[in-house]
Protein backbone atom coordinates (compact mmCIF):
# COMPACT_ATOMS: atom_id res chain seq x y z
CA UNK A 1 0.00 0.00 0.00
CA UNK A 2 1.23 3.50 -0.80
CA UNK A 3 2.61 5.34 2.22
CA UNK A 4 0.37 8.12 3.45
CA UNK A 5 1.87 11.59 3.69
CA UNK A 6 -0.86 13.27 5.73
CA UNK A 7 -3.35 10.69 7.06
CA UNK A 8 -2.43 8.82 10.23
CA UNK A 9 -4.21 5.92 11.92
CA UNK A 10 -7.21 8.11 12.72
CA UNK A 11 -7.22 10.95 10.22
CA UNK A 12 -4.95 13.98 10.54
CA UNK A 13 -4.04 15.30 13.98
CA UNK A 14 -1.50 17.62 15.57
CA UNK A 15 -0.75 20.89 17.35
CA UNK A 16 -2.82 23.88 16.26
CA UNK A 17 -0.69 26.31 14.25
CA UNK A 18 1.88 23.69 13.33
CA UNK A 19 1.67 22.03 9.91
CA UNK A 20 -0.63 20.44 8.94
CA UNK A 21 -3.04 21.82 11.56
CA UNK A 22 -3.18 25.30 10.03
CA UNK A 23 -5.94 27.31 8.33
CA UNK A 24 -4.05 27.22 5.02
CA UNK A 25 -3.84 23.43 5.04
CA UNK A 26 -7.48 23.05 6.08
CA UNK A 27 -8.55 25.25 3.16
CA UNK A 28 -6.59 23.00 0.79
CA UNK A 29 -7.86 19.84 2.53
CA UNK A 30 -11.46 21.00 2.12
CA UNK A 31 -10.83 21.64 -1.58
CA UNK A 32 -9.06 18.28 -2.07
CA UNK A 33 -11.85 16.40 -0.29
CA UNK A 34 -14.49 18.26 -2.28
CA UNK A 35 -12.75 17.46 -5.56
CA UNK A 36 -12.38 13.78 -4.61
CA UNK A 37 -16.05 13.39 -3.72
CA UNK A 38 -17.17 15.46 -6.72
CA UNK A 39 -15.68 12.75 -8.95
CA UNK A 40 -18.73 10.70 -7.91
CA UNK A 41 -21.09 13.47 -9.08
CA UNK A 42 -22.87 16.26 -7.20
CA UNK A 43 -22.08 16.00 -3.53
CA UNK A 44 -23.01 17.17 -0.04
CA UNK A 45 -20.55 17.06 2.84
CA UNK A 46 -21.48 17.29 6.53
CA UNK A 47 -19.06 19.14 8.81
CA UNK A 48 -19.17 18.84 12.60
CA UNK A 49 -16.74 19.57 15.40
CA UNK A 50 -16.08 19.29 19.10
CA UNK A 51 -15.89 22.30 21.43
CA UNK A 52 -12.25 23.37 21.15
CA UNK A 53 -11.78 27.01 20.17
CA UNK A 54 -9.77 26.27 17.02
CA UNK A 55 -12.72 24.33 15.61
CA UNK A 56 -14.39 27.55 14.47
CA UNK A 57 -11.30 28.60 12.52
CA UNK A 58 -10.91 25.22 10.84
CA UNK A 59 -14.64 24.91 10.14
CA UNK A 60 -14.50 28.17 8.17
CA UNK A 61 -11.40 27.07 6.25
CA UNK A 62 -12.85 23.66 5.35
CA UNK A 63 -16.14 25.27 4.36
CA UNK A 64 -14.35 27.64 1.96
CA UNK A 65 -12.29 24.84 0.41
CA UNK A 66 -15.28 22.54 -0.05
CA UNK A 67 -17.33 25.32 -1.61
CA UNK A 68 -14.47 26.23 -3.96
CA UNK A 69 -14.48 22.63 -5.19
CA UNK A 70 -18.21 22.81 -5.86
CA UNK A 71 -19.33 20.70 -2.90
CA UNK A 72 -22.38 21.69 -0.86
CA UNK A 73 -21.72 21.93 2.88
CA UNK A 74 -24.04 21.19 5.82
CA UNK A 75 -22.71 22.59 9.11
CA UNK A 76 -23.69 20.69 12.26
CA UNK A 77 -21.82 22.73 14.88
CA UNK A 78 -20.54 20.98 18.04
CA UNK A 79 -21.65 17.34 17.86
CA UNK A 80 -20.21 14.01 19.05
CA UNK A 81 -18.11 12.19 16.45
CA UNK A 82 -20.53 9.21 16.25
CA UNK A 83 -23.41 11.66 15.72
CA UNK A 84 -21.66 12.96 12.62
CA UNK A 85 -21.28 9.39 11.35
CA UNK A 86 -25.01 8.78 11.93
CA UNK A 87 -26.16 12.07 10.39
CA UNK A 88 -23.95 11.56 7.33
CA UNK A 89 -25.95 8.40 6.65
CA UNK A 90 -29.38 9.86 7.34
CA UNK A 91 -28.77 12.95 5.21
CA UNK A 92 -27.52 10.70 2.38
CA UNK A 93 -24.40 12.85 2.19
CA UNK A 94 -21.30 11.72 0.31
CA UNK A 95 -19.10 12.18 3.37
CA UNK A 96 -18.86 13.60 6.87
CA UNK A 97 -15.94 15.57 8.28
CA UNK A 98 -15.17 15.73 12.00
CA UNK A 99 -12.99 18.52 13.40
CA UNK A 100 -11.66 17.06 16.65
CA UNK A 101 -8.61 15.79 18.48
CA UNK A 102 -10.75 13.46 20.61
CA UNK A 103 -9.28 13.09 24.11
CA UNK A 104 -6.31 15.43 23.47
CA UNK A 105 -5.97 18.91 25.08
CA UNK A 106 -7.46 22.06 23.51
CA UNK A 107 -4.19 23.04 21.81
CA UNK A 108 -4.41 20.00 19.52
CA UNK A 109 -6.93 19.47 16.77
CA UNK A 110 -7.49 17.15 13.87
CA UNK A 111 -9.69 16.01 11.03
CA UNK A 112 -11.26 12.68 10.29
CA UNK A 113 -13.64 11.62 7.57
CA UNK A 114 -16.64 9.33 7.39
CA UNK A 115 -17.92 7.76 4.19
CA UNK A 116 -21.54 8.19 3.13
CA UNK A 117 -22.28 4.96 5.05
CA UNK A 118 -20.95 6.45 8.30
CA UNK A 119 -17.81 4.29 8.22
CA UNK A 120 -14.12 5.10 7.85
CA UNK A 121 -13.15 6.33 4.39
CA UNK A 122 -11.93 3.66 1.97
CA UNK A 123 -8.16 3.72 1.49
CA UNK A 124 -8.48 4.65 -2.18
CA UNK A 125 -10.45 7.83 -1.30
CA UNK A 126 -7.85 8.82 1.31
CA UNK A 127 -5.11 8.34 -1.28
CA UNK A 128 -7.03 10.40 -3.83
CA UNK A 129 -7.33 13.25 -1.29
CA UNK A 130 -3.61 12.97 -0.55
CA UNK A 131 -2.75 13.27 -4.25
CA UNK A 132 -5.03 16.30 -4.67
CA UNK A 133 -3.43 17.99 -1.64
CA UNK A 134 -0.22 18.18 -3.65
CA UNK A 135 -1.97 19.52 -6.78
CA UNK A 136 -2.59 23.23 -7.54
CA UNK A 137 -5.87 24.49 -6.11
CA UNK A 138 -8.58 25.58 -8.54
CA UNK A 139 -11.92 27.29 -8.00
CA UNK A 140 -15.20 26.20 -9.57
CA UNK A 141 -17.05 28.60 -11.85
CA UNK A 142 -19.25 30.97 -9.85
CA UNK A 143 -22.50 29.19 -10.73
CA UNK A 144 -20.96 25.86 -9.65
CA UNK A 145 -19.66 26.90 -6.22
CA UNK A 146 -20.97 24.84 -3.33
CA UNK A 147 -23.78 26.14 -1.13
CA UNK A 148 -23.42 26.23 2.65
CA UNK A 149 -26.25 25.77 5.16
CA UNK A 150 -26.57 25.00 8.86
CA UNK A 151 -28.56 22.08 10.29
CA UNK A 152 -30.43 23.39 13.33
CA UNK A 153 -32.06 20.17 14.55
CA UNK A 154 -28.95 17.94 14.51
CA UNK A 155 -28.88 17.49 18.30
CA UNK A 156 -32.52 16.43 18.46
CA UNK A 157 -32.07 13.94 15.63
CA UNK A 158 -29.10 12.33 17.38
CA UNK A 159 -30.84 12.20 20.78
CA UNK A 160 -33.72 10.26 19.19
CA UNK A 161 -31.23 7.94 17.47
CA UNK A 162 -29.53 7.15 20.80
CA UNK A 163 -32.89 6.45 22.43
CA UNK A 164 -33.81 4.16 19.53
CA UNK A 165 -30.93 1.84 20.54
CA UNK A 166 -32.94 0.69 23.58
CA UNK A 167 -36.41 -0.93 23.62
CA UNK A 168 -39.27 1.58 23.52
CA UNK A 169 -40.46 0.29 26.90
CA UNK A 170 -37.16 1.28 28.56
CA UNK A 171 -37.60 3.38 31.68
CA UNK A 172 -34.60 4.41 33.77
CA UNK A 173 -36.80 5.70 36.62
CA UNK A 174 -35.03 5.15 39.93
CA UNK A 175 -31.57 5.30 38.34
CA UNK A 176 -29.30 8.09 39.54
CA UNK A 177 -26.34 8.72 37.27
CA UNK A 178 -23.53 11.29 37.20
CA UNK A 179 -22.38 12.24 33.69
CA UNK A 180 -19.03 13.91 32.95
CA UNK A 181 -19.15 15.50 29.49
CA UNK A 182 -15.46 16.58 29.46
CA UNK A 183 -16.60 20.10 28.42
CA UNK A 184 -16.83 18.43 25.03
CA UNK A 185 -19.18 17.52 22.23
CA UNK A 186 -21.62 15.50 24.37
CA UNK A 187 -22.40 18.44 26.68
CA UNK A 188 -25.86 19.10 25.21
CA UNK A 189 -27.00 15.71 24.01
CA UNK A 190 -25.85 13.20 26.65
CA UNK A 191 -27.73 14.66 29.66
CA UNK A 192 -30.91 14.88 27.58
CA UNK A 193 -30.69 11.26 26.40
CA UNK A 194 -30.59 9.95 29.97
CA UNK A 195 -33.17 12.42 31.30
CA UNK A 196 -35.62 11.59 28.51
CA UNK A 197 -35.23 7.90 29.40
CA UNK A 198 -36.26 8.69 32.98
CA UNK A 199 -32.95 8.76 34.86
CA UNK A 200 -32.04 11.30 37.52
CA UNK A 201 -28.98 13.02 36.06
CA UNK A 202 -26.20 14.99 37.73
CA UNK A 203 -24.03 16.72 35.11
CA UNK A 204 -20.33 17.56 35.40
CA UNK A 205 -18.04 19.42 32.98
CA UNK A 206 -20.70 20.67 30.57
CA UNK A 207 -19.64 24.32 30.32
CA UNK A 208 -17.26 24.40 27.35
CA UNK A 209 -15.29 27.61 26.84
CA UNK A 210 -13.13 26.40 23.96
CA UNK A 211 -10.10 25.83 26.19
CA UNK A 212 -11.31 23.46 28.92
CA UNK A 213 -12.13 20.41 26.78
CA UNK A 214 -10.71 17.26 28.48
CA UNK A 215 -8.97 19.43 31.11
CA UNK A 216 -8.98 17.45 34.38
CA UNK A 217 -12.29 15.88 33.41
CA UNK A 218 -13.91 13.26 31.21
CA UNK A 219 -12.72 9.73 30.52
CA UNK A 220 -9.02 10.67 30.75
CA UNK A 221 -9.33 12.30 34.20
CA UNK A 222 -11.95 10.41 36.19
CA UNK A 223 -11.19 11.73 39.70
CA UNK A 224 -13.96 14.36 39.81
CA UNK A 225 -16.50 11.85 38.51
CA UNK A 226 -15.44 9.25 41.08
CA UNK A 227 -15.82 11.77 43.90
CA UNK A 228 -19.19 13.01 42.63
CA UNK A 229 -20.67 9.50 42.37
CA UNK A 230 -19.81 8.82 46.01
CA UNK A 231 -20.91 12.28 47.22
CA UNK A 232 -24.22 12.11 45.33
CA UNK A 233 -24.90 8.48 46.38
CA UNK A 234 -25.41 7.77 42.68
CA UNK A 235 -25.80 4.33 41.14
CA UNK A 236 -23.01 4.98 38.65
CA UNK A 237 -20.99 7.58 36.79
CA UNK A 238 -20.36 7.87 33.06
CA UNK A 239 -17.26 9.65 31.74
CA UNK A 240 -17.12 10.66 28.08
CA UNK A 241 -14.13 12.02 26.19
CA UNK A 242 -14.14 15.32 24.31
CA UNK A 243 -15.70 14.01 21.11
CA UNK A 244 -18.00 11.36 22.56
CA UNK A 245 -16.53 8.23 21.00
CA UNK A 246 -15.12 6.69 24.17
CA UNK A 247 -16.58 6.05 27.60
CA UNK A 248 -15.47 4.78 30.99
CA UNK A 249 -17.80 4.27 33.93
CA UNK A 250 -17.65 4.42 37.72
CA UNK A 251 -19.56 2.08 40.03
CA UNK A 252 -21.39 3.27 43.16
CA UNK A 253 -18.25 2.78 45.28
CA UNK A 254 -16.27 5.18 43.08
CA UNK A 255 -14.28 2.44 41.33
CA UNK A 256 -13.47 2.94 37.63
CA UNK A 257 -14.91 0.38 35.20
CA UNK A 258 -12.76 0.38 32.06
CA UNK A 259 -13.45 -0.49 28.43
CA UNK A 260 -12.53 -4.17 28.81
CA UNK A 261 -15.01 -4.55 31.67
CA UNK A 262 -17.77 -2.65 29.85
CA UNK A 263 -17.20 -4.74 26.72
CA UNK A 264 -17.48 -7.93 28.78
CA UNK A 265 -20.74 -6.78 30.43
CA UNK A 266 -22.34 -6.09 27.03
CA UNK A 267 -20.98 -9.26 25.39
CA UNK A 268 -22.04 -11.52 28.26
CA UNK A 269 -25.57 -10.07 28.20
CA UNK A 270 -25.87 -10.62 24.43
CA UNK A 271 -24.48 -14.16 24.78
CA UNK A 272 -26.88 -15.11 27.59
CA UNK A 273 -29.82 -13.93 25.49
CA UNK A 274 -28.60 -15.74 22.38
CA UNK A 275 -28.11 -12.42 20.61
CA UNK A 276 -24.31 -12.43 20.22
CA UNK A 277 -23.37 -12.73 16.56
CA UNK A 278 -20.01 -14.52 16.36
CA UNK A 279 -17.55 -13.31 18.97
CA UNK A 280 -15.81 -10.26 20.39
CA UNK A 281 -12.98 -8.18 18.94
CA UNK A 282 -10.47 -6.62 21.33
CA UNK A 283 -7.03 -5.18 20.69
CA UNK A 284 -3.42 -5.95 21.50
CA UNK A 285 -3.94 -3.85 24.66
CA UNK A 286 -7.03 -5.75 25.86
CA UNK A 287 -6.47 -7.36 29.24
CA UNK A 288 -5.66 -11.07 29.27
CA UNK A 289 -8.45 -11.44 31.84
CA UNK A 290 -11.02 -10.42 29.21
CA UNK A 291 -9.82 -13.15 26.87
CA UNK A 292 -9.96 -15.76 29.66
CA UNK A 293 -13.41 -14.67 30.90
CA UNK A 294 -14.87 -14.81 27.39
CA UNK A 295 -13.29 -18.24 26.86
CA UNK A 296 -15.09 -19.49 30.01
CA UNK A 297 -18.36 -18.47 28.32
CA UNK A 298 -17.25 -20.14 25.04
CA UNK A 299 -17.25 -16.73 23.35
CA UNK A 300 -14.64 -16.41 20.55
CA UNK A 301 -12.18 -13.53 20.97
CA UNK A 302 -9.65 -12.03 18.56
CA UNK A 303 -7.21 -9.15 18.92
CA UNK A 304 -6.91 -6.36 16.35
CA UNK A 305 -4.26 -3.66 16.21
CA UNK A 306 -4.86 -0.74 18.57
CA UNK A 307 -7.28 1.83 17.17
CA UNK A 308 -11.02 1.73 16.62
CA UNK A 309 -10.58 1.60 12.82
CA UNK A 310 -8.79 -1.76 13.21
CA UNK A 311 -11.46 -3.09 15.57
CA UNK A 312 -14.12 -2.07 13.05
CA UNK A 313 -12.20 -3.64 10.14
CA UNK A 314 -11.94 -6.94 12.06
CA UNK A 315 -15.66 -6.86 12.91
CA UNK A 316 -16.55 -6.27 9.26
CA UNK A 317 -14.26 -9.05 8.06
CA UNK A 318 -15.75 -11.59 10.49
CA UNK A 319 -19.33 -10.29 10.35
CA UNK A 320 -19.31 -9.89 14.15
CA UNK A 321 -21.10 -7.10 15.99
CA UNK A 322 -19.23 -6.06 19.11
CA UNK A 323 -15.69 -4.98 19.85
CA UNK A 324 -13.70 -2.36 21.67
CA UNK A 325 -10.64 -1.10 23.46
CA UNK A 326 -9.79 -0.80 27.15
CA UNK A 327 -9.60 2.98 26.63
CA UNK A 328 -13.37 2.96 26.17
CA UNK A 329 -13.91 2.86 22.40
CA UNK A 330 -16.79 0.38 22.19
CA UNK A 331 -18.42 -0.53 18.88
CA UNK A 332 -21.92 -2.01 18.88
CA UNK A 333 -22.57 -2.70 15.19
CA UNK A 334 -26.16 -3.68 15.83
CA UNK A 335 -26.77 0.00 16.66
CA UNK A 336 -24.02 2.19 15.17
CA UNK A 337 -21.33 2.17 12.47
CA UNK A 338 -18.55 3.45 14.75
CA UNK A 339 -17.61 3.71 18.42
CA UNK A 340 -20.43 5.56 20.20
CA UNK A 341 -19.97 6.38 23.89
CA UNK A 342 -23.61 7.22 24.64
CA UNK A 343 -24.97 4.11 22.93
CA UNK A 344 -22.36 1.88 24.61
CA UNK A 345 -23.25 3.24 28.05
CA UNK A 346 -26.95 2.64 27.36
CA UNK A 347 -26.21 -1.00 26.46
CA UNK A 348 -24.29 -1.45 29.72
CA UNK A 349 -27.19 -0.07 31.77
CA UNK A 350 -29.67 -2.31 29.92
CA UNK A 351 -27.47 -5.35 30.59
CA UNK A 352 -27.32 -4.51 34.30
CA UNK A 353 -31.08 -4.05 34.55
CA UNK A 354 -31.72 -7.37 32.80
CA UNK A 355 -29.36 -9.20 35.16
CA UNK A 356 -30.57 -7.39 38.27
CA UNK A 357 -27.05 -6.68 39.55
CA UNK A 358 -25.10 -3.48 40.16
CA UNK A 359 -22.22 -2.20 38.06
CA UNK A 360 -19.89 -3.06 40.96
CA UNK A 361 -21.08 -6.69 40.97
CA UNK A 362 -20.89 -6.97 37.17
CA UNK A 363 -17.33 -5.60 37.18
CA UNK A 364 -16.18 -8.38 39.51
CA UNK A 365 -17.27 -11.08 37.06
CA UNK A 366 -14.17 -10.22 35.00
CA UNK A 367 -10.93 -10.95 36.87
CA UNK A 368 -8.32 -8.78 35.22
CA UNK A 369 -4.63 -9.63 35.17
CA UNK A 370 -2.24 -6.94 36.43
CA UNK A 371 -1.24 -4.83 33.45
CA UNK A 372 1.41 -2.12 33.65
CA UNK A 373 1.63 0.46 30.86
CA UNK A 374 4.49 2.96 30.70
CA UNK A 375 4.69 5.66 28.02
CA UNK A 376 8.19 6.60 26.87
CA UNK A 377 8.62 9.80 24.86
CA UNK A 378 10.83 9.70 21.78
CA UNK A 379 10.96 12.94 19.82
CA UNK A 380 13.52 13.42 17.09
CA UNK A 381 15.13 9.99 17.49
CA UNK A 382 16.37 8.35 14.29
CA UNK A 383 16.31 4.93 15.95
CA UNK A 384 13.16 2.80 15.97
CA UNK A 385 13.09 1.67 19.61
CA UNK A 386 10.47 -1.02 18.98
CA UNK A 387 12.62 -2.95 16.49
CA UNK A 388 16.00 -2.20 18.09
CA UNK A 389 17.88 -5.51 18.63
CA UNK A 390 18.61 -4.96 22.34
CA UNK A 391 14.95 -4.09 23.01
CA UNK A 392 13.73 -7.12 21.03
CA UNK A 393 16.14 -9.35 22.92
CA UNK A 394 14.95 -8.02 26.29
CA UNK A 395 11.28 -8.52 25.33
CA UNK A 396 11.97 -12.11 24.29
CA UNK A 397 13.76 -12.79 27.58
CA UNK A 398 10.91 -11.35 29.68
CA UNK A 399 8.32 -13.29 27.68
CA UNK A 400 10.28 -16.51 28.24
CA UNK A 401 10.57 -15.83 31.98
CA UNK A 402 6.78 -15.43 32.26
CA UNK A 403 6.43 -18.93 30.79
CA UNK A 404 3.15 -18.45 28.95
CA UNK A 405 1.43 -16.70 31.88
CA UNK A 406 1.85 -13.15 30.62
CA UNK A 407 2.37 -10.85 27.64
CA UNK A 408 4.80 -8.14 26.54
CA UNK A 409 3.74 -5.53 24.01
CA UNK A 410 5.73 -2.59 22.65
CA UNK A 411 4.11 -0.28 20.14
CA UNK A 412 4.37 3.27 18.89
CA UNK A 413 1.37 5.54 19.39
CA UNK A 414 -0.42 6.47 16.18
CA UNK A 415 -1.19 9.99 17.41
CA UNK A 416 1.65 11.04 19.76
CA UNK A 417 5.49 10.68 19.85
CA UNK A 418 5.31 7.86 22.40
CA UNK A 419 6.37 4.24 22.72
CA UNK A 420 3.90 2.32 24.87
CA UNK A 421 5.52 -0.41 26.96
CA UNK A 422 2.94 -2.88 28.28
CA UNK A 423 3.60 -5.94 30.43
CA UNK A 424 0.81 -8.18 31.70
CA UNK A 425 0.89 -11.22 33.99
CA UNK A 426 -0.32 -12.80 37.20
CA UNK A 427 2.10 -11.22 39.70
CA UNK A 428 1.77 -7.42 39.83
CA UNK A 429 5.15 -6.76 41.46
CA UNK A 430 6.92 -8.89 38.87
CA UNK A 431 4.96 -7.30 36.02
CA UNK A 432 5.84 -3.79 37.24
CA UNK A 433 9.52 -4.67 37.53
CA UNK A 434 9.58 -6.05 33.98
CA UNK A 435 7.73 -3.00 32.60
CA UNK A 436 10.10 -0.55 34.31
CA UNK A 437 13.12 -2.50 33.08
CA UNK A 438 11.90 -2.46 29.47
CA UNK A 439 10.81 1.21 29.63
CA UNK A 440 14.24 2.20 30.92
CA UNK A 441 15.90 0.32 28.06
CA UNK A 442 13.59 1.95 25.48
CA UNK A 443 14.39 5.40 26.91
CA UNK A 444 18.12 4.68 26.67
CA UNK A 445 17.79 3.57 23.05
CA UNK A 446 15.79 6.72 22.20
CA UNK A 447 18.26 9.09 23.91
UniProtKB/Swiss-Prot annotation:
It comes from the Bacteria. Its cofactor is Mg(2+). Its EC number is 5.4.2.10. Binds 1 Mg(2+) ion per subunit. GO terms for cellular component: cytosol. CDD domains: GlmM. Signal peptide: none annotated. The modification Phosphoserine is found at residue 102. Pfam families: PGM_PMM_I, PGM_PMM_II, PGM_PMM_III, PGM_PMM_IV. The active site is at residue 102. GO terms for molecular function: magnesium ion binding; phosphoglucosamine mutase activity; phosphomannomutase activity. Belongs to the phosphohexose mutase family. This is Phosphoglucosamine mutase. It comes from Pseudomonas syringae pv. tomato (strain ATCC BAA-871 / DC3000). The gene is glmM.
